[in-house]
Amino acid sequence: MIFLIKLIFVFFILNLQNIYSYANTNNTIFFYNWTEYVPDGLLEEFTKETGIKVIYSTYESNESMYAKLKTYKKDSYDLIVPSTYFIAKMKNEGMLLKINKNKLTNFINLDPKFLNKSFDPNNDYSIPYIWGFTTIAINSNNINSNNINSWADLWNPKYKNSISLIDDAREVFQVALMKLGYSGNETNLNHIKEAFQELQKLIPNIITFNSDNPGIPFIEGEAKLGMIWNGSAYALKKLGIPLKIIWPKEGGIFWMDSFAIPSNAKNVEGALKLINFLLKARISAQVAEITGYSTPNLAAKKLLPKNIINDNTLYPNDQIIKKGEWQNDIGDNINKEYESYFQKLKNS
């Protein structure tokens, strides 16, 4: 009899733990995002609205986010924000869940031109959050904008020791590949080698590689022209730096950071609620205005001040967007080729 009572007690305790674990899981979301991508107070507002607590942590690169999810397979996050080609990579590796868009009532707010991209047709695995591009920036005090209209202009010998490049293999090679008339998502090894040889010719003009903040070389007067992210360019212009954006005739390099749900997420319903919350027009507008990045949320864009939506540093016209190229997954083996050549380039 005593044994039976003990057995019932143990069963009760274990069942209680399971109930607590279930309740805890469904009232908590683990959100892993880029640094400075959510304004202060928004997650607290979500918790107040839904009762769901958000455990928030950040990363500085897609690579570090990917490595962490690969390493800690058991204790995963519920919501992440990978960039363009990492969506395709993680989807192909079975690391992402298909998203039930029927539960996203605010999905309708998104601009159709940012949906159904090659890295995730039909947006089955990703929901756009923030987008941007890499293009050419010049210090207008040093360089006449009429002299720059192409990626090829960076190779002009008169810009010796004047150019800043982003410290990213794919983006730097995309510049050379577009200059040569190839796709920035090139997988042909001969074309990649040709791009490397073209970049070797650019070495005398390169003063620095920077990815922490591509705007810093311009602030410090180190660079007169080079590659820049539009968010960095916009921030510099607000600081009064004489920076001007140039759209190369070959097209810009476009990227998008999107919501995605890891395949081993414990609170999928909570993740969907948070996505839907962040897709609200008012919330997305707040994200765009405070972070200084472009929003793919058409309803949110209508709420932004005119000086922001009319600034082509953040919102270029449709023709420019159509001319640009979105990064896509090229596979690990090809990516290793890019990285290998890139290290050789930087060691030249």
Locate the predicted segments by residue:
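Periplasmic-binding protein-like
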Residues: 192-201, 237-263, 309
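Conserved C-terminal helix/tail region of periplasmic/extracytoplasmic solute-binding proteins
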Residues: 319-348
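Mature extracytoplasmic/periplasmic domains
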Residues: 262-322
